[in-house]
Regions:
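A short, Lys/Arg-rich alpha-helix, primarily the initiator
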Residues: 1-21
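Short, charged recognition helix plus adjacent turn
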Residues: 2-5, 22, 67-75
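Key DNA-contacting residues within the recognition helix of helix-turn-helix
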Residues: 15, 40-41, 54
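The alpha-helix within a helix-turn-helix
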Residues: 18, 29, 57
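Short alpha-helical DNA-recognition segment
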Residues: 22-40
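C-terminal edge-of-domain segments
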Residues: 57-70
Length: 75
């Protein structure tokens, strides 16, 4: 689990997820049903769609879970 900060952080987490899965980017693309160039276009977009994040996670054998928690309040 990680706390979302921004899209750059999310992209780094996705790259780590792919590495941890033991799959190559080409294999992830194949499991997603897209060409490797399309996969690169997806992960290099400025704003990732939740749908794309979910598809990448699933291709790597993971499930995307989203949880909302109360923000910490500064006193």
């Amino acid at each position: 689990m990680f706390i979302y900060g921004d899209n750059e952080q999310l992209k780094k987490e996705l790259k780590k997820l792919v590495i941890d899965s033991g799959l190559t980017q080409k294999e992830v693309a194949e499991k997603m049903g897209v060409k490797p160039q399309q996969y690169n276009n997806i992960v290099n977009k400025e704003n990732l769609a939740f749908r794309d994040v979910k598809r990448i996670a699933a291709a790597c054998g993971y499930e995307l879970q989203i949880d909302f928690v109360p923000a910490e309040q500064d006193e």
